[in-house]
Amino acid sequence: MSSLWQTVSENVVFVLEFLALIVVMFLIAYVIEKAVKKKNSDTERVLATRKIVVIGVFSAIAAILMVLEFPVPFAPSFYGLDFSELPALIGALAYGPVAGVMIEFCKILIKLVLKPSSTAFVGELANFSISCMLVLPASVIYLFKKSRKQAILGTVVGTLIMTAFGSCFNAIYLLPKFSELYGIPLDAIIGMGTAINPAIHSISGLVLMCVVPLNLLKGGLVSLITILVYKKLSPILKAAHKQ
């Protein structure tokens, strides 16, 4: 815990930027969910008390899945594959976009307790923001009409948005920020990609050949698993927040 506070104190400005992004994501999710619920004449509260209990359980599962990260052969070691978006996506489909963002946020907090940041919070920021780009569009599309077809459409759109956003965010902000915080030249980071794939010679090359396939793979697998299990879990989740 002391190492966590030390990391926070050493990167106060970055942590504040991270918190601002979290607030923005919550506001976007809340405004959209309230608007859709009003359109559908749905009077259920956005965050009922019983929902929060399930959200807590899903957040803990997501944090454990985030720690269990796997290396991928086509990307440097600071990129990894995890399935922490799975509980968030399932929770978002069941309870709405706000629940999905809350699971993503609580996941990061729990993960930092289980395993302190090794990237000065850059990795956690990347995971939260990029994951929300999958969870938010998918759950919003599903919220308009809750059907299997709509869920598939939502996860496909979410995966594409996550991939596009993740690519731009890495190139424009995350990789330069990682370089700045750790004092590692961008050329050295690009070199890590070149060591794996000789065709990588620039930030854009690193993003196109590492970040894009990683996000497509992650989004595709998480979406597929969600579609396969959600129908069976849905009655249980709905019953849980009505009890």
Question: For the regions a protein language model found, what residue spans apply to each?
Answer:
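Loop-helix junctions at membrane interfaces
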Residues: M1-Q243
